[in-house]
Amino acid sequence: MDGSASSPVGDLLFVSSSGGHLAQLVALRPWWTGRRRHWITFRTPDAESLLAGETVDWAYHPTTRHLGNLLRNTVLAARTLHRYRPDVIVSTGAGVALPFFVLGWLVGIPTVYIEVYDRIETPTLTARLCRPFTSALLVQWEEQQRLYRGATLVGRLL
């Protein structure tokens, strides 16, 4: 991703789980500073601290094998995309990303999935599920390019 604030990307929607997934998106601060942005993540102490002063909607968790929260997050995605109308959706996973990528893809919003830095030998489930709805897949390790044909190597975020 171009580090300059003058690159052609407009309003950003960041979607991720809390913890390391969120930390990797926050590490992109030089790229997103100065742009209008909105965050979707889980309400945890680390997320509240990292995103103090940011515009955030809290997602429902757990997301693994929890149909109720998948449906709630799908409603959240529809409401957020309608209200905020981002120019691009960026995510490092995990499960909360899927409804945002599917609905974003359906309405023509570009989606960027950044594979997490700690999965080098096998693809994550979220990356596999989001891949059909992903405009650009970015990886942090050269080894990850073997897992995802056509992925772009961007290097480590952390």
Role assignments for model-derived ranges:
Residues M1-F42, L51:
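N-terminal subdomain of nucleotide-sugar transferases
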Residues S16-S18, R35-N73, E143, V154-L157:
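Conserved nucleotide-sugar phosphate-binding/catalytic loop shared by glycosyltransferases and other
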Residues H21-Q24, A47, A97-F100, T122-P123:
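Short, well-ordered alpha-helical microsegments
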Residues L25, G93, L137:
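Residue-level signature of catalytic and energy-coupling elements of molecular machines
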Residues T64-V88:
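An amphipathic, basic-hydrophobic alpha-helix
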Residues V88-V107:
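An aromatic- and histidine-rich active-site surface loop
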Residues I109-L158:
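Active-site-proximal region of nucleotide-activated glycan assembly enzymes
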